[in-house]
Amino acid sequence: MLKYVETKNAPAAIGPYSQAYEVNGVIYTSGQIPVNPADGSVPEGIAAQAEQSCKNVGAILEAVGSGFDKVFKTTCFLADMGDFAAFNEVYAKYFTSKPARSCVAVKDLPKGVLCEIEAI
């Protein structure tokens, strides 16, 4: 079963994609950047941006009755691998079950943000 997932508690997609899909009980989120869904603002600094990205992932998971403890794989994108340690500090507070993860540095992220997180 394929189910489109959308919540106002996470930022709307900024392109031709969805926030997430649930497929046979598994949730696949699109990458969540640190945009505050209430006002569209982006906080400054990697710690605040990682926090907002995690909150956005959490809002999507909550919308389908799931949570961080059910996530088994994430892909994280950083604009600067120098932010790896600071990003991990925040990430570890949310993803306490330590899902499998890939984390890569990329040249640019949408809206010039410092991080993006997608989860399964």
Please provide the spans of the model-predicted regions.
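Short, polar/acidic, helix-capping and beta-turn segments at strand->helix junctions
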Residues: 2-120
